[in-house]
Structures are given as structure tokens and as C-alpha cells.
Amino acid sequence: MFAVIKAGGKQYKVDRNSIIKVEKIDGELGSKIQFDQILMIGEYSKPSFIGTPIVKGAVVTAEITNQLKDNKIIVFKKKRRKNYRRKAGHRQELTELKILDITKQ
């Protein structure tokens, strides 16, 4: 069984026991969280349920396995011949989740 969940403004396709990295979610390591904004749920051999915009009664349960930071990206702006240069770096904080269960009532 798989589901498409909405977390942090992005969509993720998840299976049971899969590990995903999403934007930072506050919580302790080992704590369980539930996603109720499920956009689609289905099985590989049966028809899927597509939400309008979410599937009612569907819940994905996940466990926080790690809090980490992504690789650093460099943002560089320049205007030629004007001696204008700006350099900034950014590291996005991420949360690693293990999907425990996908249910639909």
C-alpha cells in the first residue's frame, strides 16, 4: 500500500517502512506523528483513492528517526561592471521519518 502525503508544502509518495526526509518537524527522536493530509492512497494491484483535495479518513503514522541538516547551498548575486556582489549560504533543517502504517477507514 502507498500514499501521497503533504508535509511542509511538498508532496511525498510513501510506502510502509520507507524512510523519507521532510522539512523540520519539531519532536523528540522516537516520537510518533500522524499525517492527516493524504492526497492519494492506493495499492499497486487495485484502484487508488484520489482526494478532492484530501482523502477523508486516511492517516499515515510515522516515527521520527533523525533530526539533521541538508548540504549547504550557496546563493550568489552579481551585477557586472558595478562591483556589486552578494554571497549567502543556507542549510535546510530536515527531519528523517520512518513510515510505520498507512490506514483508511
Curated annotation (Swiss-Prot):
Disulfide pattern: none
Keywords from the UniProt entry: Ribonucleoprotein, Ribosomal protein, RNA-binding, rRNA-binding
Protein name in UniProt: Large ribosomal subunit protein bL21
GO molecular function: rRNA binding; structural constituent of ribosome
Record-stated family: Belongs to the bacterial ribosomal protein bL21 family.
Organism lineage: Bacteria, Pseudomonadati, Pseudomonadota, Alphaproteobacteria, Rickettsiales
Organism: Rickettsia akari (strain Hartford)
GO biological process: translation
Keyword Ribosomal protein: yes
